[in-house]
Amino acid sequence: MATSSAVLFFLLAVFAAGASAATFRITNNCGFTVWPAGIPVGGGFQLNSKQSSNINVPAGTSAGRIWGRTGCSFNNGRGSCATGDCAGALSCTLSGQPATLAEYTIGGSQDFYDISVIDGYNLAMDFSCSTGVALKCRDANCPDAYHHPNDVATHACNGNSNYQITFCP
C-alpha cells in the first residue's frame, strides 16, 4: 500500500511539474475605467485608471481571449457596455463587438498569442510574452493584428511564460 501511494505521489508530482499556469498581468493606462473580460478564464471585472490585476490561466487553455470593455454600467452583475459588451454580463462567457482582442493558447512547451481586430477595434493595446515579441495595436489598422481570418499574425512563446496586456499604452 505504501509503495502504490509513493508511486501515485511521484506521478502526480511529475505531471504537475510539466503543466504550469501562465500569469497574465493586465494594466489599465487609460484615463478612464476599463472592464477587462476573458474567456474561458477571467470572466470580467472593473479596472480603474492606472490599476493592474493578475489572472492565472492554466496550462492546456486554448482559444483564450481577453479584451477591455468601455463605457460600462453594472448593477448586481448585470448591465451594459458601450464597447466589448458580452450580453450584459459582468462575467463573460462570450466576447462582444467591437473589441480589440488579446488571443492565446497556453500549451505545454510552446504557447501561441496574437492581437485580433477582426471583431472590431475599441482600445489601444500592447500584448507581450515574457519570452517573445511585444505586439502593439494603437488603431484599427495596426500591423501587428489579425484583420482577416486568413492573416498570419500568430506568435509563438516558450511554455511557462507570463504575459502582459496593457490598455492605452
Swiss-Prot record:
UniProt record, GO biological process: defense response to fungus; killing of cells of another organism
Presence of the UniProt keyword Secreted in the record: no
Pfam families: Thaumatin
SMART domains: THN
InterPro entries per the UniProt record, alphabetical: Osmotin/thaumatin-like_sf, Thaumatin, Thaumatin_CS
UniProt superkingdom: Eukaryota
Name this protein carries in UniProt: Thaumatin-like pathogenesis-related protein 2
Naturally occurring in which organism (per UniProt): Avena sativa
